[in-house]
Amino acid sequence: MTKDLYDKLMVFGNDREPFLTHNFMRTTDLDDGTATVTLPMHTESLNRWGGAHGGILFSLCDVAMGMAIMTLRQEMVVTVN
C-alpha cells in the first residue's frame, strides 16, 4: 500500500466517516490486506443484557473488512451485502 493511500484511509477511518465517529470506532493499524479497528464499548452499544449488541459487532467486522480490502485494491470501496 502506498503512503498516500495509508494516510487517506487513516483519515477516512478516524475523522471523515460520521458512522464510525458516532460509534467510537477507530482504525488503529493498516497493512496490506489487514486492518485493525477498535471499538470501545459505550452504553449505547450494549444490548439489554449488558453485552455488545450484535449490530455493532457486525458493523465492526464490516468496517475492518472494508478497510482491509481497500489496502489491497489501492482505492476506496464500499461494502455491500
Mark where each language-model region is.
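Terminal targeting signals and extreme-terminal segments of soluble enzymes
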Residues: 1-81
